[in-house]
Amino acid sequence: MRLSPRSLCAAVRAAWRESFPLEGRDVARWFPGHMAKGLKKMQSSLRLVDCIIEVHDAQIPLSGRNPLFQETLGLKPHLLVLNKMDLADLKEQQKIIQHLEREGIKHVVFTNCVKDENVKQVIPTVTELVGSSYRYHRGEHVEYCIMVIGVPNVGKSSLINSLRRQHLRKGKATRVGGEPGITRAVMSRIQVCERPLMFLLDTPGVLAPRIPSVETGLKLALCGTVLDHLVGEETLADFLLYTLNRHQLSGYVQHYGLGEACDDIASVLKRVAVKLRKTQKVKVLTGTGNVNVIQPDYPAAARDFLRAFRSGLLGPVMLDRDLLQGRSAEES
């Protein structure tokens, strides 16, 4: 008996993993000296700061934010900017906002700083927050000093540059990178607006000294907030594949022309490597000596898989969907 396409898809999904093996995995800590120093410098600069803008990745709105920020940066007015909204599936945006409100986060703006989407909301929101708060030790200064904080590689520098484009018609003032750790020290003030006169302090990305769970660590790593090799590129690619299949997102199938979804990372990476012509020579010892064998370059395929995800080529993804639905990978 032949199965209908729908029945066939259901049968394939039934064979997919229901959970990702997290036991025994030790997500490496990425808390080098410049992170600890950066947090101390932020604290020492607080006296001059009117408001805190915390930037985080919109794909993980409920995961990976550094709890030390709340503890060390005190009662300053706070705006959470969820950046890279173009990469996130925001069908449940209202649920995200409600979840954050329960955590005490009352002011949230979703942005895409690369294309300046929603960035115009930031300065009016900050101005209102500062205007309704007591400006400790600031006297009658008319300018605003805003500190931009967040974990690595979420778009803090991109936000500053976007604000300058929007309000000053000027270009980059701070370097932007696709890897964590580009901004190494608390920088001098950068003007982003004339009216009101507003300066921003760009700061280095600071992760929590301890990532609370392996699942959170993997999500952070997928978003590029820790260096891939600390977790393992093929491990990250496998977690990404598991997540996409579990959410029934088949963008990777179309992007790589795979024909059908698959839950085996070795098989997927092999097909990706063949399609991209990513191969490597490997010496194999035989009875007649060493023989060079051409094999798929699995690490190169994994890197391309991750790059495609981070570039939005696999479609928008909400990595915290389980948390929004009250589940985690360990429970599912």
From Swiss-Prot:
Alphabetized UniProt keyword annotations: GTP-binding, Membrane, Mitochondrion, Mitochondrion inner membrane, Nucleotide-binding, Transit peptide, Translation regulation
Keyword Cytoplasm recorded: no
Annotated ranges, domain CP-type G: 36-209
UniProt GO MF annotations: GTP binding; GTPase activity
Compartments, as annotated in UniProt: Mitochondrion inner membrane
InterPro entries hit by this protein: G_CP_dom, GTP-bd, GTP-bd_ortho_bundle_sf, GTPase_MTG1, P-loop_NTPase
Membrane topology: Peripheral membrane protein
Cited CDD domains: YlqF (cd01856)
Main location: mitochondrion
Binding site for GTP: N83, K84, M85, D86, N153, V154, G155, K156, S157, S158, G205
Mitochondrion listed as a keyword: yes
Stated family: Belongs to the TRAFAC class YlqF/YawG GTPase family. MTG1 subfamily.
Functional summary from the UniProt entry: Plays a role in the regulation of the mitochondrial ribosome assembly and of translational activity. Displays mitochondrial GTPase activity.
Oligomeric and partner information: Associates with the mitochondrial ribosome large subunit; the association occurs in a GTP-dependent manner.
Name under which the protein is recorded: Mitochondrial ribosome-associated GTPase 1
Species this protein is from: Bos taurus
